[in-house]
């Protein structure tokens, strides 16, 4: 084991003992916010320290076997004991490496998923509708709750823009690599000569802001407009100004919400999206600075990056970041994207392990 890794584990061992002492003290629950942070930290490192304890036991077994080898009558037995201990140490070291990988603090959060039609006009809007169905079906398979925050429909039944709120377990962890440009190649419904057209949509996956950590927004920097909500072609027209548009003047960020009949609930939901967008923009700026020093295949989240192509005539989906092509486009457009999500997560983990090895 590398000295740097050993030092990290020794530090965590000491820290767990400190946390045990803090959490059992009489003062522990006087500040509940601080208490929750301590219990979260305890939960994060307890498994690591437990595995490190098993590693140290195997290490002690290997040393005891080495001593035993000095006795000629015990040499064969000692060799076998040492071999087993070394194998256990190697297995535990691999597990500890993965446990020491930096945690994404947003992994367990709910998300706002935004799909915007880009180049390609009506065909792009129809593809946005296809992506909406893909992510909705995927969410249903995961047992997540799906809420439509805002939807701007196009004339042909697609979407110029749609924002979803996905609620459930590890939502951001599963979807965080979906941000970027999604390109589609197919014969549009409006094409009379059978020509293949290329169009695109952008997807943004933004973790829902934690109330304790959310950015503070000055109300004076907001412009709030209300208007009547309506569907495509003027359907479902509300007789009251229940729809809400909030503009954050310093950043120019605009959020609309008209899904609920209550103006109050629309305003509340729009504020949540606004805060998440501002926090997401700050995170992306931070990632771009990091990317200048370490090129990452995945996770830059740059909206201008084309990350994936959906080629319907060939029945394939290609993710350009990891050069993965899967020939099951119908199943994937119906929400079966587990293989893709798993491959992206594995590549990201491999990158983190490589970075840990360099440190």
Curated annotation (Swiss-Prot):
Asked if the keyword Cytoplasm belongs to this entry, the reply reads: yes
- Tell me, what is one Gene Ontology molecular-function annotation carried by this entry? translation release factor activity, codon specific
State the InterPro entries in the record.
PCRF, Pep_chain_release_fac_I, Pep_chain_release_fac_I_sf, Prokaryotic/Mito_RF, RF-1
Transmembrane stretches, start-end: none
> A single GO CC term, please?
cytoplasm
Processing and modification events after translation: Methylated by PrmC. Methylation increases the termination efficiency of RF1.
Residues found modified as N5-methylglutamine: 235
Keywords in alphabetical order: Cytoplasm, Methylation, Protein biosynthesis
Checking PROSITE patterns in the record gives: RF_PROK_I
The record, for SUPFAM superfamilies, names:
Release factor
Q: Where in the cell is it found?
A: Cytoplasm
The superkingdom listed in its UniProt entry is Bacteria
Query: Chief location of this protein?
Result: cytoplasm
Provide the family line.
Answer: Belongs to the prokaryotic/mitochondrial release factor family.
User: Its function?
Assistant: Peptide chain release factor 1 directs the termination of translation in response to the peptide chain termination codons UAG and UAA.
Name used for this protein in its record: Peptide chain release factor 1
Species source reads: Polynucleobacter asymbioticus (strain DSM 18221 / CIP 109841 / QLW-P1DMWA-1)
Q: Which gene encodes it?
A: prfA
């Amino acid at each position: 084991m590398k000295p740097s890794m050993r030092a990290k584990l020794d530090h965590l061992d000491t820290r767990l003992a400190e946390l045990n002492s803090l959490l059992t003290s009489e003062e522990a629950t006087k500040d509940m916010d601080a208490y929750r942070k301590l219990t979260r930290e305890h939960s994060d490192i307890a498994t690591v320290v437990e595995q490190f304890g098993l590693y140290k036991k195997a290490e002690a077994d290997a040393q005891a076997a080495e001593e035993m080898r000095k006795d000629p009558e015990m040499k064969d037995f000692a060799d076998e004991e040492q071999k087993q201990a070394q194998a256990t140490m190697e297995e535990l070291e691999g597990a500890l490496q993965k446990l020491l990988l930096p945690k994404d603090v947003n992994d367990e959060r709910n998300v706002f998923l935004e799909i915007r039609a880009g180049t390609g006009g009506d065909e792009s809007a129809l593809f946005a509708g296809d992506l909406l169905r893909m992510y909705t079906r995927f969410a249903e398979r995961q047992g997540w709750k799906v809420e439509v925050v805002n939807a701007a429909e196009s004339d042909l039944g697609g979407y110029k823009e749609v924002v979803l709120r996905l609620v459930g377990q590890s939502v951001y962890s599963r979807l965080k690599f979906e941000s970027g440009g999604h390109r589609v190649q197919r014969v549009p419904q409006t094409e009379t000569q059978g020509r293949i057209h290329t169009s695109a949509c952008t997807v943004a996956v933004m973790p829902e802001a934690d109330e304790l950590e959310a950015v503070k927004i000055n109300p004076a920097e907001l412009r709030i407009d209300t208007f009547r909500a309506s569907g495509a072609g003027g359907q479902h027209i509300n007789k009251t100004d229940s729809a809400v548009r909030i503009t954050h003047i310093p950043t120019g960020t605009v959020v609309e919400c008209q899904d609920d009949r209550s103006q109050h609930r629309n305003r509340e939901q729009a504020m949540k999206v606004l805060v998440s967008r501002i926090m997401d923009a700050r995170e992306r700026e931070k990632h771009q600075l990091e990317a200048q020093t370490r090129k990452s295949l995945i996770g830059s989240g740059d909206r201008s990056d084309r990350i994936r192509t959906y080629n319907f005539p060939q029945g394939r989906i290609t993710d350009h970041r990891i050069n993965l092509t899967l020939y099951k486009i119908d199943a994937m457009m119906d929400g079966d994207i587990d293989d893709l999500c798993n491959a992206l997560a594995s590549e990201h983990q491999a990158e983190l392990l490589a970075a840990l090895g360099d440190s």
